């Protein structure tokens, strides 16, 4: 029917940082397959992050994100609040890195909660 969105399993997130070649504050699509998260951008192509490389997933307001990751606890939101989803992972070269996405609703949180459900983030070797 008119006005209904097609449910193709993809969510739109605003990319903030971490994906090489993806523009900051521009939308990208994210979807899950059996073993990874796939990020696509109409301009830059595709990036794939295997679940096995994910170390943690955090969800926080913009003020906390800017303070923790940029040592500058400020906000740019004009109306409402931006929420950041941060995926900490180990790169294929062994470096600790992160991806950051934002949204003004619970889209990011719901998507990354599903990622948590599919990964074994609960078992950590110290």
Task: For the regions a language model picked out, list residue spans one by one.
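Short polybasic amphipathic segments
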Residues: 11, 36-40, 85-89
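Acidic, Ser/Thr- and proline-rich intrinsically disordered linker/docking segments
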Residues: 2-3, 56-126
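Short, surface-exposed coil-to-beta transition loops
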Residues: 25-27, 44, 80-84
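Phosphoinositide-binding peripheral membrane targeting modules
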Residues: 22-24, 32-72, 121-125
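Anionic N-terminal interaction surfaces
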Residues: 1-36, 46, 97
């Amino acid at each position: 029917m008119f006005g209904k969105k097609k449910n193709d399993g993809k969510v739109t997130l605003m990319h903030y940082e971490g994906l090489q070649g993806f523009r900051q504050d521009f939308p990208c699509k994210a979807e899950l397959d059996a073993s990874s998260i796939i990020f696509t951008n109409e301009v830059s192509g595709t990036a794939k992050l295997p679940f096995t490389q994910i170390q943690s997933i955090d969800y926080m307001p913009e003020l906390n994100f800017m303070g923790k990751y940029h040592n500058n606890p400020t906000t740019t939101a004009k109306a409402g609040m931006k929420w950041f989803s941060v995926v900490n992972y180990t790169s294929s070269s062994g470096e600790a890195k992160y991806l950051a996405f934002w949204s003004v609703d619970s889209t990011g949180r719901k998507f990354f909660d599903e990622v948590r459900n599919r990964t074994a983030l609960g078992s950590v070797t110290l």
